[in-house]
């Protein structure tokens, strides 16, 4: 017995000295954190050592037997036993400590366990009575501190993490799916921050008190909201939530520029989440669910197509990888060749023949669609591909008319500006020039058809959405200029007609050569060189030229349909944006030198070899064409011997050329090259995104016939008009019937019995509806549940497949340490039991030996 106790004491002393030696070696330089006069008793030191290294038997024995132990004592870093046990992943020690009442720092231990991903320890801590009501999980450490509560405190100096970090936010930051799920079941949620420009009392007070902490708290909240773990587990529609959140974060990146990179990273994180969910789809039904939203309300038929609401939202928010994903593109391609499934697999030659056939027979196809819009041919024409071909062919014909309208002047001007030709001697010259030709009449019909199409688009999308698309602005500008041009031309024609009417009524001669006419009438007989600069016909011709240029530039709209020209069109658009950015600096430098050179030479008008810089207009022309090397150095030379002015002019002109040509133009070239490289590096995604935008404009119902065939209403249009009138009448009748029913119900409620019966019936119907809603999840919800399950499982597998890091090695080391103490305890118990057995055996055999010895002695005596 003495030998056994001696062995135990030697073993315990050896273990304790070894532990103290290890801790002393680690802690040595850090005793500076201790306050003066504070120290631990040997019992507390041993207790903290046992908790840190997972010595379960010692911790259990000290908690059960010691009367003087302070289990909330802290070490040199201010950590108590619970924090040390959690930090080293000792679940059994943590469970033993959580059984004690008035245990401190439970909240910090929870945050520590979440940050390290210790799920079982998190579950054990959440079962603590402190989290019974759930309020601890909804309040941030700062709010707890304001309530004079150090629940989340790391030590007396503050919290381990930021004051606004709640357990659910920390779990979301760490992408701990299981912990996030546990906290969500406990009722924890991440509150979405208020709008950046919110002026409520709470936001105003936080901004006034500490603007930096307010911004950081918003950033931490958005980091939690944008985490894949929180998005996938907290939202009923994770795809929609992620898309909207990505747009909000992108908007905040432009507002809070100090956190621009952080917000952009979070926005990209949301976009990657959406792409990851789409990548896990296994069949068409799941792809449709993501692209369209709730598939229960999507009807595939001849008259209805899926809404593609998620794709429209992704295009609006520029989630390019989502739109360019193969699953999304395959679905869009299927819809693009709707009712033309055989054409999809055909060669380019066959497709070209189909396009050529549509080009030749477009008028006949339009007539057939007017007569039978619901026939097989009508359904074929309503397919997106055929609508695209029809509109492209129509616009090509329109461009051809513009070319034909100018063909009479291709060989050069047949009449000089000072010459006039008329059909008969008494005809006024302007009547002949202002008449509309047959090509111009056709152009006007096309313009009216395009205006009607744009009006329908504005009616369907709304003015705000319409303005957001740059191509719509181009169409609006082009059509507006055409209308202004034709209006000015028509006004000139009216004035000329009035003059011709005056001549027909008041002039009796056969010719107008020797006739004295009033000035307002004689003006319309003059040749072009005598027209006023503000003449309506001159204005009309200038506007018409601008409209023609815009019309041909609109060809770029259909270029994304081709894989070769699509990236070039995207690069061109990006180049235009770069030029607009460059124009800010360009205009600033240009105006500075223009005003400076004008001030220098404005006093020398007529005293220069050319009029450069003598007026603002001449200064503009000289400096602008100097960029392209079309201005001469003689522009700064004076006829007088004013060398100082000339030298200043030479210097300014030279500095201007160096600044504009050498510096700024090369900077513009570098910007354009950089934009092109960005497009080229991700050309496939950029092109597919642009092509999807083009396709989507033809997926909507309506606008089947292109201009000008859309000006003639089809029988289908009359049918839809009648149906809309019918629906309006039905709604009106229902509203009247509902008002009568409400009056009747009010009469019923006057009776107590009827009132009770009415309320009971309403309650039963509401309960039945609620039960049906709760018991039957929608088809969309089932699909999203499957996809989110796959996403979570994939995320966990990817995380497990990562290389073993230093933290995991440390966890293994702590497990081995805890196992060592358990083995030592079992060994000690086994040694004690063996010593007891040996003692019992020795006692038993000792008695038997004594009896035999007595017998032998008695025998000798006898």
Swiss-Prot record:
Highest taxon in the source lineage: Eukaryota
Cytoplasmic side: 1-351, 405-465, 559-581, 673-862
Sugar-bearing residue positions: 514
Membrane topology reported for the UniProt record: Multi-pass membrane protein
Residue ranges of the region described as Disordered: 1-21
NCBIfam families listed in its UniProt record: trp
The protein's name: Short transient receptor potential channel 7
Gene name per UniProt: TRPC7
């Amino acid at each position: 017995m003495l030998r056994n106790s001696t062995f135990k004491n030697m073993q315990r002393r050896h273990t304790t000295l070894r532990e103290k030696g290890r801790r002393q070696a680690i802690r040595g330089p850090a005793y500076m954190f201790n306050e003066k006069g504070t120290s631990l008793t040997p019992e507390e030191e041993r207790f903290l050592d046992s908790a840190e290294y997972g010595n379960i038997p010692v911790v259990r024995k000290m908690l059960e037997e010691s009367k003087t132990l302070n289990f909330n004592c802290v070490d040199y870093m201010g950590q108590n036993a619970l924090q040390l046990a959690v930090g080293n992943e000792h679940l059994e020690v943590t469970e033993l400590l959580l059984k004690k009442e008035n245990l401190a720092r439970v909240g910090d231990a929870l945050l520590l366990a979440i940050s390290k991903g210790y799920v079982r320890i998190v579950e054990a801590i959440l079962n603590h009575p402190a989290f019974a009501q759930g309020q601890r999980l909804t309040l941030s450490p700062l709010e707890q501190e304001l309530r004079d509560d150090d629940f989340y405190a790391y030590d007396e100096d503050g919290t381990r993490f930021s004051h606004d970090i709640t357990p659910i936010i920390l779990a979301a930051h760490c992408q701990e799916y299981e912990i996030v799920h546990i906290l969500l079941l406990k009722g924890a949620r991440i509150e979405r921050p208020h709008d950046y420009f919110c002026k409520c009392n709470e936001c105003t007070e936080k901004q006034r008190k500490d603007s930096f902490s307010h911004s950081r708290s918003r950033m931490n909240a958005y980091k939690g909201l944008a985490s894949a773990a929180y998005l996938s587990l907290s939202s009923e529609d994770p795809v929609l939530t992620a898309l909207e959140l990505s747009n909000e974060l992108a908007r905040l990146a432009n507002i809070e520029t100090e956190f621009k990179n952080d917000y952009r990273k979070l926005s990209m994180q949301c976009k990657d989440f959406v792409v990851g969910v789409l990548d896990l789809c296994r069949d068409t039904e799941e792809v449709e669910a993501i692209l369209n939203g709730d598939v229960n309300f999507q009807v595939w038929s001849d008259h209805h197509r899926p809404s593609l609401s998620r794709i429209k939202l992704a295009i609006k928010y520029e989630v390019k990888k989502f739109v360019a994903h193969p699953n999304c593109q395959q679905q869009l391609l299927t819809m693009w060749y709707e009712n033309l499934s055989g054409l999809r697999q055909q060669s380019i030659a066959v497709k070209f023949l189909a396009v050529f056939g549509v080009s030749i027979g477009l008028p006949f196809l339009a007539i057939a669609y007017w007569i039978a819009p619901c026939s097989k041919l009508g359904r074929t024409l309503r397919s997106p591909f055929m609508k695209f071909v029809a509109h492209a062919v129509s616009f090509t014909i329109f461009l051809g008319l513009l070319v034909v309208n100018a063909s009479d002047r291709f060989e050069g001007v047949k009449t000089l500006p000072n010459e006039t030709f008329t059909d008969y001697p008494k005809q006024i010259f302007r009547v002949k020039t202002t008449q509309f030709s047959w090509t111009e009449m056709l152009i006007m019909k096309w313009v009216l058809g395009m205006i009607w199409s744009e009006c329908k688009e504005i009616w369907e999308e709304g003015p705000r959405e319409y303005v957001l698309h740059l191509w719509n602005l181009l169409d609006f500008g082009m059509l507006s200029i055409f209308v202004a041009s034709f209006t000015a031309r028509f006004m000139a024609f009216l004035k000329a007609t009035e003059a011709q009417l005056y001549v027909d009524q008041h002039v009796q001669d056969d010719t107008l050569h020797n006739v004295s006419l009033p000035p307002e009438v004689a003006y319309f007989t003059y040749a072009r060189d005598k027209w006023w600069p503000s003449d309506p016909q001159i204005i009309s011709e200038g506007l018409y030229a601008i409209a023609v240029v815009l019309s041909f530039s609109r060809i770029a709209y259909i270029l994304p349909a081709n894989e070769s020209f699509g990236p070039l069109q995207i690069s061109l658009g990006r180049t235009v944006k770069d030029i607009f950015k460059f124009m800010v600096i360009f205009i600033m430098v240009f105006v500075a030198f223009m005003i400076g050179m004008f001030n220098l030479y404005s006093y020398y008008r007529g005293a220069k070899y050319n009029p450069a810089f003598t007026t603002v207009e001449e200064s503009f022309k000289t400096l602008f064409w100097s960029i392209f090397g079309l201005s001469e150095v003689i522009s700064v030379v004076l006829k007088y011997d004013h060398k100082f002015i000339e030298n200043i002019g030479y210097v300014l002109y030279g500095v201007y050329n160096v600044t504009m040509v050498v510096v700024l133009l090369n900077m513009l070239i570098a910007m354009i090259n950089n934009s092109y490289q960005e497009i080229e590096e991700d050309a496939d995604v950029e092109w597919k995104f642009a092509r999807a935008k083009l396709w989507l404009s033809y997926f909507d119902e309506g606008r089947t016939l292109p201009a000008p065939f859309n000006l003639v209403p089809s029988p289908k249009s009359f049918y839809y008009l009648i149906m809309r009138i019918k629906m309006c009448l039905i709604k009106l009748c229902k509203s009247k019937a509902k008002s009568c029913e409400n009056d009747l119900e009010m009469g019923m409620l006057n009776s107590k019995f009827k009132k009770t019966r009415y309320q009971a019936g309403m309650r039963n119907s509401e309960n039945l509806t609620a039960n049906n809603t709760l018991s039957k999840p929608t088809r969309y919800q089932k699909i999203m549940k499957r996809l989110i399950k796959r996403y979570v499982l994939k995320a966990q597998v990817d995380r497990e497949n990562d290389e073993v890091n230093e933290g995991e090695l440390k966890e293994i080391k702590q497990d081995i340490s805890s196992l060592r103490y358990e083995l030592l305890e079992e060994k000690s118990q086994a040694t004690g039991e063996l010593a007891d057995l040996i003692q019992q055996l020795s006692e038993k055999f000792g008695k038997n030996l004594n009896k035999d010895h007595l017998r032998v002695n008695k025998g000798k005596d006898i």
